[in-house]
Amino acid sequence: MMKHMHIKIKKLHSHAVIPSYQTPQAAGFDLHAVEDSLIKARDRGLVGTGLAFEIESGFEVQVRPRSGLALHNGVSVLNTPGTIDSDYRGEIKVILINHSNEDFHIHRGDRIAQAVVSEVTQAVFTEVQELGQSVRGERGFGSSGVARKGHYQGKPLA
């Protein structure tokens, strides 16, 4: 069963579009550009939505790319996922990056990103002198390879 939480929305501009889900089971809702803009080839830009959110405490909204923009236009969200904290009250803006060799024109009302509501868990930090051992240890940055899943150094993981 789908969970729900309430987001209060303030329109900061008359052309702002209130978000909605496109299908009954959609996880993400679309964010729309509030005005025309241009992102030059191989450049980035900040695109406003003309909206401000009041998100319930204990939740965040994650801003993510739209797959169609990425596939068909080479345009994505630069800092993905972008986080909108529950205590932020300013305009929701999206940093888009144009990976293509052609300028990308954004028209008022275009869907520029999608957003997903997520519950927040805050960590409690404890400084220690030593960390527990693990199979992986300090190996990172591609050390697990790209082939054969479930193996470590050529041996199956138990």
From Swiss-Prot:
GO terms for biological process: dUMP biosynthetic process; dUTP catabolic process. Gene3D superfamilies: 2.70.40.10. The keyword Metal-binding applies. Its EC number is 3.6.1.23. InterPro entries: dUTPase, dUTPase-like, dUTPase-like_sf, dUTPase_trimeric. Substrate binds at residues 66-68, 79, 83-85, 93. The keyword Disulfide bond does not apply. It catalyses: dUTP + H2O = dUMP + diphosphate + H(+). GO terms for molecular function: dUTP diphosphatase activity; magnesium ion binding. Residues 139-158 are annotated as: Disordered. Disulfide bonds: none annotated. NCBIfam families: dut (TIGR00576), PRK00601.1 (NF001862). This is Deoxyuridine 5'-triphosphate nucleotidohydrolase.
